[in-house]
Swiss-Prot record:
This is P2Y purinoceptor 4. It comes from Mus musculus (Mouse). Residues 59-68, 128-149, 219-242, 306-361 are cytoplasmic. The chain crosses the membrane at residues 31-58, 69-91, 109-127, 150-170, 193-218, 243-265, 284-305. Disulfide bonds join 104-181.
Amino acid sequence: MTSADSLLFTSLGPSPSSGDGDCKFNEEFKFILLPLSYAVVFVLGLALNAPTLWLFLFRLRPWDATATYMFHLALSDTLYVLSLPTLVYYYAARNHWPFGTGFCKFVRFLFYWNLYCSVLFLTCISVHRYMGICHPLRAIRWGRPRFAGLLCLGVWLVVAGCLVPNLFFVTTNANGTTILCHDTTLPEEFDHYVYFSSTIMVLLFGFPFLITLVCYGLMARRLYRPLPGAGQSSSRLRSLRTIAVVLTVFAVCFVPFHITRTIYYLARLLNAECRVLNIVNVVYKVTRPLASANSCLDPVLYLFTGDKYRNQLQQLCRGSTPKRRTTASSLALVTLHEESISRWADIHQDSIFPAYEGDRL
């Protein structure tokens, strides 16, 4: 067994008080799965998000509120994928980290920063869509781009502030020539880390996920009401696609990771037997790449829900000169025909929902 393998229990196994000090994790799969999966996420994530950022910055301005959320979502994904080459090297080198303790802390911090910023930006999009479909008058007041920009800034700062303790928990540990970059913390601090991590999970994933489910449930009920007109059917279809894409990202990327991580932490805290710990550890490690894959799935949201974004991207891929800047409007609204609402909307021409027609990016 190599020195890295002998250290696996130190970073991943139960705390010393568990009495299972002889439990060794068989993690050979990790040294193949994680480098390959992170490399794929890096290539695809950069290829998908870099053009997205370029289009938002140079071809789809001025932004509406939803485009603002999507730009920040793409920015978060891009920053994360740029850190992945170091993790590819780390796991390919069998848990050897030569980049220093500070960069170890930064890379682990960046993983959760991207994860929870993505969750909150998707939640912002969900609430914004819910307001536009179910409460259009309120959406005009609260859905302005300036408000969305301030909210995005708040998301960045709040998530970063909540994750500051992670910078103290995460560290490196040397054993001979092998240096581990812990994804949690040292064994003696693991109990405290679990309490911190669980609190963060409830605040930055549990509540936002619940809000997203409620918003999309109410939206789906509203959208399935029969409305005359082909244009409205097209708007409803785009909105339903939005629901499907966002819930798919949650179901594939976020939910499995948080469930398996919670089980993994509980198994260690409850001093589960070694066989159970090994099974839980394998399942948890398999879901880590899924959490990273949100950087590749998020751009699907822009493609499925925005006609103008899709057209601009097609022109970019064909090498043709894109049309001059157009207003970015990422998601469609259901057309509302109430005369009083239309008159009210005409007064607010600077709103992001002009005349309540279906917005198309």
